[in-house]
Amino acid sequence: MEQIRLDHQLPVKKTDHTSKGDQLKWKIGNIWYKSDYMGYEGLSETLVSHLLQKSTLSHPFVLYQPVRIAYRGTLRSGCSSPDFLKTNQMLIPLEKLYRQNTGDSLAITLAAFSEPAERIRFLADQMEHMTGIQNFGAYLTAMLEIDAFFLNEDRHTNNIAVLYDTETEQYSPSPLFDQGLCLFADISNDYPLDLPMDVCMERIEAKPFSSDFDTQLDAAEELYGIQLHFSFTTKDVCTELASLADYYPLEIRQRVEQIIRRQMRKYGYLMRS
């Protein structure tokens, strides 16, 4: 079990926005550490990124590892990941980029469209125009496939981002990141462990193109096609969860296994043996 003591380290002050508050976050050398805030975010980050290694995803993604963080007299679970920014690179959220170019809010602009497909196409076209990145619609679709499968309720316009190289003045897609609020990880507020699975499914809402995961996923795949397939098995899921036994109790791991099994059945067209 990896453990790090951060009693004398100040958390990084966040300047972005999240829909459910901020986790404590530190950068030590080239490694980021995030503490669980509402439940088992570290498990979600770790499990989702490890399972993405068994997929056909063509875009880079951040790989997370579990960690126990000692901070101000408490020991809490969380995750760590390498800093993916290279020299001269900046991470620019799409909300910020759109405001810089138009003076308007991207989230409000998207909400003005009546259909999810219109929102997705508009965003893809705008980002290709503003950044020169090609096939941005395919990138968005892969992101939405991951979010639908793993039930990511926190995919807003501030955590979809691009990279900007200040030396070459070129943009590139950001590695996919921020999967902490997947798999009903918020057990403090919306999805307590004793809440039935069907109620959790009814309660969760997607972002940013529709409140329904399948509505925005179907719209994106209709526009840009299916972008990835998963090749992990239920045995792989159980193995990954077993490796997290030192960090999260059995009740949480069993719940997550149940969720993944359910999603594998629902999205069978994304599964490949």
Question: Can you annotate each of these PLM segments?
Answer:
Residues 84-144, 248-254, 266-267:
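ATP-dependent phospho-/nucleotidyl transfer catalytic cores
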Residues 36-37, 53, 167-273:
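C-terminal catalytic region of ATP-dependent kinase domains
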Residues 56-59, 154, 270:
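Short helix-capping/linker segments at secondary-structure and domain boundaries
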Residues 118-185:
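Conserved kinase catalytic-core segment
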Residues 1-106:
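Conserved ATP-binding subdomain of kinase catalytic cores across diverse folds
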Residues 62-71, 156-166, 273:
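Short alpha-helical "patches" and their helix-cap loops
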Residues 41, 45, 139, 153-156, ...:
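Active-site-proximal structural scaffolding
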Residues 28, 33, 64, 81, ...:
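Generic structural hydrophobic/aromatic packing signal, biased to beta-strands
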